[in-house]
Amino acid sequence: MRRILPLALVLLLAGAGPAPAQPALQTADLGRCRLESGAVIQDCRIGYRTAGTLNATRSNAVLVPTWFSGTSGALVGQLGPEGLVDTTRYFAVLVDALGNGVSSSPSTSARPDSTFPVFSVRDMVATQHRLLTEHLGLDSLHAVVGLSMGGMQAFAWMTRHPSFMDKVVSITGTPRLTPQDRLLWRAELRAFRATDPNGTRAAMKAVSAIHGLHLHTPEHLATMDSTDFRDFVAQREEHILAFDPHDWAWQIKAMLRHDVTAPFGGSLSRAAAAVEADALVVTVTQDHMVNPRPARRFARAMDAERLALDTPCGHLGTGCKADTVRTTVAHFLRDDP
């Protein structure tokens, strides 16, 4: 029987060495955060952690935003000499995206319900830019490195603040959603609402089944025996039920609005032409959760470095090919900051 690893362990690209010490969670108070929609998040707060040492020229900072439903605490596993971001070389800023239950979210507001303002991926990036410039005193980054929804934020960084960083790495992210992606996220929202309009945690079990179905490929799921499958379902439900239902829904709404080509009239080529940073785009050919085609097209349009992984692990293929991804990212980042 194969051991089914929890999502956090599979998705992380941590090295085989000892786990790095957990840096303290910090909070930046941004006051009012005006969103693209015109709505405002009052008492806007962003959670973050830092690791490593900022060099004398302040040129070695690397921003790592969270993936969907992830936290900065979970990102710590990517740090260290054998991790995705080597904190003996870089000053890592791990940032909690809006809606993850640490930064401003429906669950952290005075009224944790559907009255919380709807935000976008670009709004996530806007709050991160304010964190860096207003609270950490950084006017540039060496790199932005993001996985999954973090990879979507990486694409948004490329076009919203094209000259702010030297390098960008998007891993299983996308510049805009395909119809397949939209069907998935809309199905989760509708299952959530249809099962229980009030959004209780019990409704999340229906969401868990849809989510788990798309994390892997049919080929991968077919290799599970009955015990593997029970463990897989139990671990998926444990992960999802631990997350606030409204936070889950609001981050989905942000992804459904994600399209970095929108400010460029929907033109992918115009959006790609605006990118100034060097870029590395990592995709999984058999990703059923984030369709890799837009990322590949965008990468070709901006002549970015590309790594395509062919693995039945699907969206979690970066975990199954962790050594390849770590080596490629480390080499890409290694230019002296």
Label each residue range with its predicted role.
Residues 288-294:
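Conserved alpha/beta-hydrolase "acid-adjacent" motif
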Residues 312-323:
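Catalytic histidine-centered segment of alpha/beta-hydrolase-like enzymes
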